[in-house]
A protein has these predicted regions:
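Bacterial Sec-dependent N-terminal signal peptides
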Residues: 1-23
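Metal-dependent phosphoester/phosphodiester hydrolase catalytic core
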Residues: 20-484
Length: 484
């Protein structure tokens, strides 16, 4: 239970000194993540680890063929899943990126920037070993538009000294009556094995930090469970991949310091184009969702939310996996990705909004174009009914734009003589880009670049507000801009 106490700078200094003592963990190798921020609330996440960092000097995994992977998955061959990917005589703890969790207790301190004397301090709480040694705090009654500072402490158990501490911060959105310039970044599709800085992670993270965004959105495919090194066909291997990725310095530092919204897509929960009934090895589709929603990321009762960021901007974050049915069903009014409740919520909240600019953020395309062989998103022919239903609604709105992830190329699509615009942010590294040919520039394309990077969106408030969509390369350099 959170309790408010006055705590001075001397007290904070004392706790910091304690944390420097030679104590063997637990530590915060996976840092802090936050999620679902609105004007008055946010969710904070952390995990306790045995070591200060992951074992990035461990042994490499063995690559097996995709055919072998599929056989192991279909036959639920747990012994084979490990023995074919881990060298003989070794175990998972010997492998590159191993970052085991550990039991212990955590305590949260947070305060409005510049007001450490009014810090709110939580009780010491044990992390949950059944949820990968993680813990979450749901903070409420916060102040809109304020920047908060965070410090979390760790100790092995009650009565023992502090073993580690970690700093972080987050910014809450201003209320709907406050004019405010807002900038945010959107990314998609990057995993550990396709990072472009082997020592640190993905270069887009320091590049985005240079822009000083107010918040950040990851549209999903954060990690690929169905890619090698290793193929994660058990819960243990899924957790291994999450823990390894979030121990990378670039990722960890960025998440500690920025308000974030984490979405999911197919590869995060199992196999490519996953849906109910499409399990991956020993991990059911539903369990993959649960590990993402309840364990590895900040938790929210619904996986969709709309957030007002000041007078001129409102965003909609929609969920593309939890409420869908099977891809192979015949198209029609009952076939869905969004689900009936989420879809009606979107229509109702957009109609109720008076924001100057509205941005729908989705894990996968609605307009496209996409590849002909795909049948997993609203731009594909297998979902034409629901696509038309949503686009017919968007056509009637003013200044409502679609931003999406999933596709491994950057693009801007506009359907002439309509209000339909879609901005694909692209993959997080050049090595991850592909799936489309640069020369395949369609009539609806306003911009096309088969390279990695990210998207930034800037809303300038005032008497004549505007919104700017900028595609960046991995180093942060602008490669395309569209202003409305």
């Amino acid at each position: 239970m959170l309790k408010k106490i006055l705590i001075g700078i001397i007290g904070l200094f004392y706790l910091s000194c304690q944390s420097q003592l030679d104590i063997k963990g637990p530590y915060f190798a996976n840092g802090i993540k936050n999620g679902w921020a609105d004007q008055n609330s946010i969710v904070l996440w952390t995990r306790l680890t045995q070591n200060k960092s992951a074992n990035f000097k461990g042994h490499p995994f063995i690559e097996i063929s995709r055919e072998k992977m599929k056989s192991l998955s279909e036959n639920l061959d747990v012994e084979g899943i490990y023995n074919t990917q881990i060298p003989e005589g070794l175990s998972l703890k010997d492998m590159e990126g191993y970052c085991p969790g550990v039991s212990g207790e955590v305590q949260l301190h947070y305060f409005v920037k510049g007001q450490p004397e009014a810090a709110v301090v939580s009780d010491w709480t044990a992390v949950n070993p059944n949820k990968d040694f993680t813990h979450q705090w749901k903070l409420k009654q916060l102040q809109a538009g304020k920047n908060y500072r965070v410090k979390i402490y760790a100790r092995p158990q009650k009565g023992q000294k502090i073993s580690d501490s970690i700093f972080g911060q987050f910014l809450l959105p201003a209320d709907e009556n406050t004019p405010k310039h807002v900038k945010f970044c959107v990314v998609s599709c990057h995993d550990y094995n396709r990072r472009d800085d082997p020592e640190n992670g993905h270069k887009i993270y320091p590049s985005m930090s240079q822009l000083q965004p107010d918040f950040y959105v990851h549209t999903g495919d954060i990690e690929y469970m169905d890619k090698p090194f290793p193929y994660a066909m058990t819960e243990e291997l899924m957790r291994f991949k999450w823990n390894r990725l979030f121990a990378l310095p670039f990722q960890r530092l960025f998440y500690n310091d920025h308000t974030s919204y984490f979405m999911k897509d197919d590869h995060d929960v199992g196999y490519d184009d996953s849906y109910p009934g499409k399990d991956y090895g020993t991990v059911t589709f539903e369990r993959g969702l649960e590990i993402f929603d309840e364990e590895q990321f900040p938790t929210y009762s619904k996986r969709y939310k709309t957030i007002r960021w000041g007078k001129d901007l409102q965003i909609w974050i929609v969920e593309g996996r939890n409420y869908r049915n099977q891809n192979h069903l015949e198209d029609g009014p009952d076939k869905t990705i969004w689900g009936t409740a989420q879809k009606q919520w979107f229509f109702d909240t957009v109609n109720a909004s008076d924001a100057s600019y509205k941005v729908l953020i989705t894990s996968s395309p609605i307009l496209g174009p996409d590849r002909k062989n795909k049948n997993d998103n609203l731009s594909n022919s297998g979902y034409s009914y629901e696509q038309e239903e949503i686009l017919n609604f968007i056509k009637k709105q003013n200044n409502l734009f679609i931003v999406n992830g999933d596709r491994h190329w950057q693009y801007v699509t506009h359907i002439k003589n309509t209000k339909l615009w879609e901005f694909g942010c692209g993959a997080g590294a050049d090595v991850h880009a592909g799936g489309w040919k640069q020369e395949d520039f369609r009539p609806e394309h306003q911009f096309l670049r088969v390279k990695g990077g990210f998207l930034s969106v800037t809303v300038n408030s005032g008497s004549e507000p505007n919104i700017k969509f900028t595609h960046h390369d991995v180093d942060g350099q602008p490669v395309n801009e569209v202003v409305f």
